[in-house]
Amino acid sequence: MPLLFLERFPWPSLQTYTALSALLLAGTVLSAYSTVRDSEFSSALSEGPQNEELKLENLGNVATGVLLHLITDSLFVWVMVNTACCILMLIGKVIQCIVFGPLRVSEKQHLKDKFWNFIFYKFIFIFGVLNVQRVEEVVLWCLWFSMLIFLHLMVQLCKDRFEYLSFSPTTPMSSHVRVLALLVSVLSCCGGLAVLCALAGHIHGMHTVAFMAAECLLVTVRTGHVIIRYSIHLWDLNHEGTWENKSSYIYYTDFIMELAILSLDLMHHIHMLLFGNIWLSMASLVIFMQLRHLFHEVQRRIRRHKNYLRVIDNMESRFAVATPEELAANNDDCAICWDSMTTARKLPCGHLFHNSCLRSWLEQDTSCPTCRMSLNIHEGRREREEGQREPLEDNMAAAGAADARAHINQHNHFFHFDGSRIASWLPSFSVEVMHTTNILGIAQANNSQLNGMAHQIQEMFPQVPYHLILQDLQLTRSVEVTTDNILEGRIQVPFPTQSTDRTPIQMNAASEDGAGASSGSEVAAPEAEDFEVRGSRFSKSADERQRMLMQRKEELLLRARRRYLHKKPEDGDAYSVLGADNDDSVPSIEDEDSDSVTLRRRRLAAAAERRILRQEPSPF
């Protein structure tokens, strides 16, 4: 939190800071000169007149006295420290203009984060670990850490710029030369700081030398790391053809250097913890948290290296090197890096990839990059759990069995808190919230694969709706199992709608038998007709949707005609009320058991008619 406050504080610009520092230094020098001159003037009056040589000697003594006064005074010495910091900032600005030019947003953010973390942590080190009481020692440590932070920022800036330039093959060589020359200069400055550490060992003791040497070694190793990476990149640029072993050199360079930096930092913090009696202080908590973070980083790096070795072993044992005939027959570029292939490895699906590209891919996924076919690289449960926690490093876990239970389809929400962005001693932790959409724990295949299998089954069973086949495939993920379910009746197929003729139904209204025969033929007609399966309501095909709409329209017209014809009276005394239900069956009104409600209504209507006729008077 204090770092956030410092970052949001309205700091002055470099021009304003330089002007204020110059004014402050001038005022301090004038004040010190007036003090020294008064003392020298009083001594000169007591000694009498002097010649020119003595006057020049007195001027030299005055300059020396002013400098000593600035260094020894408890207030003026901080002005000198501020002046040194201002000079370093101006040197850094000049280096930026000559070597880097305008900085990118990410580079500025990295510099800001590293600067404030370094300031906060070294403040804890000076006043919490060393427990410095004298002003002179505080000044010396401030000057020492000012030089260190300057070198750290230069190395960080060179690293960010190298990562940016390495992605562009058209970068001019002059840009690389400038950055590499700056790295060599930083490395030589680290050698000079090592000499200062050796000189300080005779005065301040071995513990102080160990602290200074650890900080100096950290800068040296980081600088050497960037120089080696830069050398590999420049060699690859000037090397003709594809350098297959480049990724291996880069990986082992990163692994050795990062492990060396973490080990040095870990021993440095252990030394700080054991140096002072700080077991019950705030500084001890800070160091303990930093030790925990470094220890977990070492574990994570070693675990990642084991995963790398496991990937190499699986790749070399399972996937053979492609022969020249296969490369000539394929005649294609690598699908990962889009570069031509002189050597490649062949997957079981037949696709070819560079050795380094395939290794990088298998560290993240265990399927073919082109067709997404599972490679079935089986590992233990422990590796699977590690792969869920670190998907970019340890996800070479099992792809699952080929039957039906490979993975669980989950929607994950990953939240990560990086404490090092706020302060280097803050911990980093991650929270992953998962919910499973498949209760049975069966993975859902790719949509394209499911659609292909569903169309294949529908060609064999056209009477089964497409959506029912797709629902069963989402559970079984197997064409054979879904086919068995259809044959054994486990999939409930709805009764299909028959295709109807557009010609109106001709009914014989003269005789009751003719009507019965026509209705009977209508009921029996669907048995002789071919069935047409109605597609899904939300079909993707426009033709299928249009056909479904016309079919539904014809059904509604047919039912309306039937209702109209069956409600029309056929004889003078009797009415035939025929209803069309969902099965298109025509019930007979002569059967009393068919519809008791209709018969009761007819009887009531006949009785009411007779009553009305009796009440009417006779005309004669």
Swiss-Prot record:
Instruction: Give start and end of each CUE domain.
Output: 449-491
User: What Enzyme Commission number(s) appear in the record?
Assistant: 2.3.2.36
Pathway per the UniProt entry: Protein modification; protein ubiquitination
Q: Which reaction does it catalyse?
A: [E2 ubiquitin-conjugating enzyme]-S-ubiquitinyl-L-cysteine + [acceptor protein]-L-cysteine = [E2 ubiquitin-conjugating enzyme]-L-cysteine + [acceptor protein]-S-ubiquitinyl-L-cysteine
Q: Where is the composition biased (Low complexity)?
A: 510-526
Kindly give the PANTHER family that the UniProt entry links to this protein: E3 UBIQUITIN-PROTEIN LIGASE AMFR (PTHR15067:SF5), E3 UBIQUITIN-PROTEIN LIGASE RNF8 (PTHR15067)
Protein name from the UniProt record: E3 ubiquitin-protein ligase AMFR
Q: Which gene specifies this protein's sequence?
A: amfra
